[in-house]
């Protein structure tokens, strides 16, 4: 029988879009839908955005974040931290061809950056099972 964490990881693999919330300069949550470009398990998610975006400004000021995803009435809500990644090697590793529409200079585009979300706490509602738990480092 699959654990709730395994179910959540499988669900995340099927979700193309997640909601990522930063904390604004005024202290309010600012959730935005974003394309999930990669993930590990249920709790580490990679996303991309422009280095000049408001969310990057927020995360550089305060890395605390929330991330949620859902499918067919099931959902996972995570809290954790976001790291803004700008090193060329990692940017190249995660580059996807459709990014060229937003970053015309490819993975070397100075505005292209990655966001790495790592959860510290999770709330699961999957198959009518409701669980809150700390996320252990893997």
Predicted segments with their positions:
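General beta-strand recognition
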Residues: 19, 44-46, 77, 123
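A short mixed-secondary-structure module that forms the rim of ligand-binding clefts
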Residues: 37-71
């Amino acid at each position: 029988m699959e654990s709730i964490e395994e179910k959540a990881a499988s669900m995340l693999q099927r979700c193309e879009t997640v909601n990522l919330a930063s904390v604004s300069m005024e202290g309010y949550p600012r959730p935005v839908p974003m394309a999930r470009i990669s993930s590990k398990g249920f709790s580490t998610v990679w996303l991309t955005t422009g280095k000049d975006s408001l969310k990057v400004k927020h995360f550089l000021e305060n890395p605390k974040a929330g991330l949620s995803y859902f499918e067919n009435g099931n959902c996972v809500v995570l809290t954790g931290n976001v790291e803004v990644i700008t090193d060329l090697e990692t940017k190249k590793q995660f580059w996807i061809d459709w990014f060229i529409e937003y970053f015309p200079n490819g993975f070397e585009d100075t505005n292209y950056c990655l966001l790495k979300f790592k959860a510290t706490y999770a709330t699961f509602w999957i198959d009518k099972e409701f669980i809150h738990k700390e996320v252990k480092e893997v």
